A protein has these predicted regions:
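Disulfide-bonded cysteines in secreted/extracellular proteins and peptides
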Residues: 15, 42-45
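Short Gly/aromatic-enriched secondary-structure transition segments
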Residues: 50-58
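Glycine-rich beta-strand-centered segment in the early N-terminal region that forms part
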Residues: 28-42, 57-110, 145-147
Length: 222
C-alpha cells in the first residue's frame, strides 16, 4: 500500500520580487461562503507580466484610485486569475449547489473576514491559479458546461472582460466599432461585437499574427 503524506503545503509558482520561483506555500483554507478548488488550467495574463516587472510601481499608483491594491509586493504572491478549476471541498455556510469534482470558473475575487475584497492572484493571502489549490467565493462561481474542454474554459475571464467592454459601450447598432490592439481581450471584444451583429468591425494591431486572428474572430477591416 502506498502512503501519501501531505504536509499542509502546496506547490506553486511564487512571485518573489522580480522573479518567479517554484516552491511551496501553505494550503489555502476556505472560510464561510467559500470553497477549495484544485487548479486544472491557468493562463498567463498580460497583467501578470506587468506585475512581475513593475509590482512596486503598480502598488504605488493604485493608491491614487478608489480601489487600491491591498497587497505587499515585497512578500510572496501566487498569481493567476484566468483559470479553470475543480471543486475539492466547501467551507461553512455554503449552499453546496455543485458537486465535489465539478469544473468551475470564477470571478477572481475573495472576501476577507473583515469584509474587504481581495483579488485572487494579486494578494498575499489568496493565491491564484499558479498554485495547486485556490479558495474561491461560492457566489462568484460559474459551472463549466459539459462539452467545453478545460483549456477553453480557462478563457472565460478574458472573454468576460471583452464582453463587459462591449456591454458598457451601449452600442445602438449603427456604429462602426474600432478595436485597437488584438491581444486576447481585443479578440474577445471582436467576438462579442460579432455575436451582437454589430459591424463592420475595424481592427488594428502591429502584429501580423494578431491581425490574422482578428480576421478569424470576425473583424471586417484589418
Amino acid at each position: 500500500m502506498k502512503l501519501v503524506v501531505r504536509l499542509f503545503s502546496m506547490r506553486a509558482v511564487v512571485m518573489q520580487g522580480p522573479q518567479l520561483v517554484v516552491g511551496t506555500v501553505p494550503d489555502p483554507r476556505p472560510g464561510p461562503g467559500q470553497l477549495l478548488v484544485k487548479t486544472l488550467v491557468c493562463g498567463i495574463c498580460g497583467s501578470d507580466l506587468h506585475m512581475l516587472k513593475s509590482a512596486r510601481q503598480i502598488y504605488e499608483a493604485s493608491k491614487e484610485t478608489q480601489e487600491p491594491l491591498r497587497t505587499d509586493p515585497s512578500k510572496d504572491i501566487v498569481m493567476g486569475h484566468e483559470f479553470c478549476a475543480e471543486i475539492l471541498d466547501y467551507g461553512s455556510g455554503t449552499r453546496r449547489s455543485l458537486a465535489v469534482g465539478s469544473r468551475v470558473c470564477s470571478m477572481p475575487f475573495a472576501i476577507r473576514g473583515n469584509g474587504v475584497i481581495a483579488a485572487v492572484g494579486y494578494s498575499n493571502d489568496f493565491p491564484g491559479g499558479y498554485g495547486e489549490q485556490m479558495v474561491l467565493e461560492e457566489s462568484l462561481l460559474v459551472e463549466v458546461p459539459n462539452g467545453l474542454d478545460t483549456d477553453r474554459a480557462a478563457l472565460t475571464e478574458p472573454m468576460a472582460v471583452g464582453a463587459h467592454a462591449v456591454e458598457k459601450a451601449q452600442l445602438g447598432g449603427d456604429e462602426v466599432p474600432v478595436v485597437i490592439g488584438c491581444g486576447p481581450v481585443g479578440l474577445a471584444v471582436i467576438a462579442s461585437l460579432r455575436l451582437r451583429g454589430v459591424g463592420p468591425i475595424i481592427a488594428a494591431d502591429y502584429s501580423p499574427t494578431r491581425r490574422g486572428l482578428a480576421e478569424q474572430m470576425g473583424a471586417d477591416v484589418i
